[in-house]
UniProtKB/Swiss-Prot annotation:
GO terms for biological process: translation. The lineage of its organism: Eukaryota, Viridiplantae, Streptophyta, Embryophyta, Tracheophyta. The gene is RPL6. GO terms for cellular component: chloroplast; ribonucleoprotein complex; ribosome. It is found in: Plastid, Chloroplast. It comes from Spinacia oleracea. Component of the chloroplast large ribosomal subunit (LSU). Mature 70S chloroplast ribosomes of higher plants consist of a small (30S) and a large (50S) subunit. The 30S small subunit contains 1 molecule of ribosomal RNA (16S rRNA) and 24 different proteins. The 50S large subunit contains 3 rRNA molecules (23S, 5S and 4.5S rRNA) and 33 different proteins. This is Large ribosomal subunit protein uL6c. Component of the chloroplast ribosome (chloro-ribosome), a dedicated translation machinery responsible for the synthesis of chloroplast genome-encoded proteins, including proteins of the transcription and translation machinery and components of the photosynthetic apparatus.
Length: 220
């Protein structure tokens, strides 16, 4: 005795197509804005000591500092301000509470402090020439470097810098602008960076050169 099949089973056996419709709930997506936590810069909040022999002049977003070694100036972005306190300190503070202002706060505090130190004490970079026949001399406003090339390297010394050579292999670059001092010293080094096998080249006095063992030294 055969039992009648349900209607939905008949469609399977008879090859009938069954369309199944489903309803998918639509969810509305909302966006939320993340608040930015603008913490005060640890460096930016530190006051800047101004020596007695340094004069400060402020006009709007412009600051000028003048000392025994010369004069430097800087223009601040609108995100930061500089204030001269009665105690004689300079303080850089944020004008607005944004992430960019937080970044500018510490940067311009450092730049301002470098200016004050630069016009009062100055900055210097010392380099050492290592290699047979490597030597340096100063001729007028030019620094002459003999570094194993077919011709000596001649570098014009910027007006705001002083370059001194001792024992033909020790070069001292000094000046009031830290960035200019660093850039000129880096250019000197770039002519012959210290190579890692014998250590020949131009290096900073306090630079540690990582040495590599040559292939001959690896053979047992």
């Amino acid at each position: 005795m055969s039992l009648p099949l349900p209607s939905h089973m008949k469609s399977v056996f008879l090859g009938m197509k069954v369309e199944i419709s489903t309803s998918v709930p639509v969810t509305r997506i909302g966006f939320w804005r993340k608040s930015v936590d603008c913490k005060e810069s640890r460096i930016g909040k530190q006051p800047i000591t101004v020596p007695a022999n340094v004069a400060i002049a402020m006009e709007g977003q412009d600051l000028k500092v003048k000392g025994p070694l010369g004069e430097l100036s800087i223009t601040y972005p609108r995100e930061v301000l500089v204030e001269k306190q009665e105690s004689g300190f300079l303080r850089v503070r944020k004008a607005v509470e944004t992430r960019r202002a937080n970044q500018m706060h510490g940067l311009f505090r450092t730049l301002t402090d470098n200016m004050v130190v630069g016009v009062s004490k100055g900055f210097e970079k010392k380099l050492q020439l290592v290699g047979v026949g490597y030597r340096a001399t100063v001729e007028g406003k030019d620094l002459i470097l003999s570094l194993g090339f077919s011709h000596p390297v001649r570098m014009a010394i910027p007006d705001e810098l002083q370059v001194k050579v001792e024992e033909n292999t020790k070069v001292t670059v000094s000046g009031r602008d830290k960035s200019v001092v660093g850039q000129f010293a880096a250019t000197i080094r770039s002519w012959r960076p210290p190579e890692p096998y014998k250590g020949k080249g131009v290096r900073y006095v306090d630079e540690v050169v990582r040495r590599k063992e040559g292939k001959a030294g690896k053979k047992k």
